């Protein structure tokens, strides 16, 4: 399947870029002292997610190993990554910085599932889980865990937490 193969490599490149690029986005030094870098890297992150990362993730979700539910989870991840990134873009365009920051935290939490999945997968490997169960459990924990951590970070920093869902 050449389309899958190309999608896979594009998705991997996009994910690696997004993880590295986002590190500059959460730096208070860069935000305050080098705002142009923040803006340029932010625009690039959004472009890479919306054009490369999320669409290839959605395509590959149809072929993911595991059960129907794991394929649905991969679809959800791709769609939520796209949606949260789009909301981050929309909210900064109307100068709603708090909502922008919160939506981008959510977006980054989806990008980071690639990392947390591998950490859990390695951890459960040492507990002698069979490969498929390890894969499924690691996937669910990484996605739900990252989403919960993102919401906790947003909640902890925000006095108007619920308003960011409406922005």
Where do the protein language model's features map onto the residues?
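Alpha-helical membrane insertion/targeting regions
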Residues: 1-167
């Amino acid at each position: 399947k050449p389309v899958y193969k190309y999608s896979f490599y594009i998705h991997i490149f996009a994910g690696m870029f997004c993880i590295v690029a986002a590190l500059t986005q959460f730096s208070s030094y860069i935000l305050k002292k080098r705002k142009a870098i923040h803006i340029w890297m932010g625009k690039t992150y959004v472009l890479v997610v919306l054009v490369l990362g999320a669409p290839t993730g959605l395509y590959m979700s149809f072929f993911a190993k595991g059960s129907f539910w794991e394929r649905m989870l991969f679809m959800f991840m791709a769609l939520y990554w796209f949606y949260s990134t789009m909301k981050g873009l929309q909210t900064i365009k109307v100068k709603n910085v708090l909502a922008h920051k919160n939506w981008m935290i959510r977006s980054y939490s989806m990008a980071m599932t690639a990392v947390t999945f591998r950490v859990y997968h390695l951890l459960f490997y040492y507990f002698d889980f069979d490969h498929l169960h390890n894969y499924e459990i690691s996937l669910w924990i990484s996605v739900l865990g990252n989403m919960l951590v993102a919401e906790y970070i947003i909640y902890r920093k925000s006095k108007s937490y619920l308003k960011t869902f409406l922005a």
